[in-house]
Amino acid sequence: MAEVANNEQQAPQFNIQRVYTKDVSFETPNSPAVFQKEWNPEVKLDLDTRSAKLADDVYEVVLSLTVTAQNGGETAFLCEVQQAGIFSISGLTEPQLAHSLGAYCPNILFPYAREAVGSLVGRGTFPQLNLAPVNFDALFAQYVQQRQAAATAPAAEEANA
């Protein structure tokens, strides 16, 4: 009887329904003067992920990248890309689902976002920009660790009071 119950449990399923650009922005606030300066930029990458449940076993994951290039203390360009995907995910435990939404799906979306950023920077006539790979598994593990530390900190403070 237990074997029948185990066989009836849903096997893990993961499908990409759609990958799309949700929002994009490219600004060169100091053009054309920025093109006349020696190019020695400081490039900063900020990224964020968020997810939302759309229906049973259907989720949207959005990876947001903001790339800012400073050259000589001025903003050369600001590029923002929100790359999104709709994923069907079922048969996972809660921690597995959280990992899928927080690390696995962003890993799928990142190459698309990186290509969009590179294309926008090129269309702005700036030198080629190659974003380094991002370890979303490590970022997700760090996020989980920070949440656990934050959850135990108030309990520790109450115990010391």
UniProtKB/Swiss-Prot annotation:
Q: Does the keyword Coiled coil apply?
A: no
Q: What is its main location?
A: cytoplasm
One Pfam family name is SecB
Under SUPFAM superfamilies, the record lists: SecB-like
Q: What Gene Ontology cellular-component terms does the record carry?
A: cytoplasm
Is Protease among this UniProt entry's keywords? no
GO terms (molecular function) for this protein are: unfolded protein binding
For biological process, the GO terms are: protein folding; protein tetramerization; protein transport
Where in or outside the cell it occurs: the entry states:
Cytoplasm
User: Keywords for this entry?
Assistant: Chaperone, Cytoplasm, Protein transport, Translocation, Transport
Kindly give the PANTHER family that the UniProt entry links to this protein: PROTEIN-EXPORT PROTEIN SECB, PTHR36918
Function noted in UniProt: One of the proteins required for the normal export of preproteins out of the cell cytoplasm. It is a molecular chaperone that binds to a subset of precursor proteins, maintaining them in a translocation-competent state. It also specifically binds to its receptor SecA.
Query: Member of which family?
Result: Belongs to the SecB family.
Tell me, how does this one assemble? Homotetramer, a dimer of dimers. One homotetramer interacts with 1 SecA dimer.
Indicate what this protein is called per its UniProt record.
Answer: Protein-export protein SecB
| Classification lineage | Bacteria, Pseudomonadati, Pseudomonadota, Gammaproteobacteria, Alteromonadales
